[in-house]
Amino acid sequence: HSKIIENIDVGGPTIVRAAAKNYNDVTVITSSNQYETLINELENNKGSTSIDFREKMSLEAFSETAYYDAVISNYFNKIKKTNFPKKKIIYGNLIEKLRYGENPHQEAAIYSKTQNLNIEQIHGKQLSYNNYNDIFSALTISKSLPKNSGTVIVKHANPCGVSINKDS
């Protein structure tokens, strides 16, 4: 616990926030993954960055520091066993924009605390919210079965078929 407290960075996020706040005059980047985007912006704008670009980078910077703070906040809630804190911070990394939300006219995306859900789509169209809902429902049901012993079929988050291998 004391090692975690010692490693909480206060100065870095403060500098990032200050730069992001001053996006009218400052371009802030928070990741080496943004280098190429910044270089392209500078090349396309005679060595400068546009206000739209600076606003976008500011948004990403504030998102990054908010994410960092959320991880710390949730850590303290976990060690204090605070099941229902006054403010709950839900955070995640964008994994994938989905084909559509619960209904075709709605947008949706999958976020995760990790960078990968360890799900591989083998065939078919891009998944929708309903497809992911079915996947997670099937996984929840299958976890109650003995390992490698059965199959679960789900439609609209409702199990419509479960089989168990009698030889298991």
Task: For the regions a language model picked out, list residue spans one by one.
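Conserved short-loop catalytic and cofactor-binding motifs
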Residues: 4, 26, 126
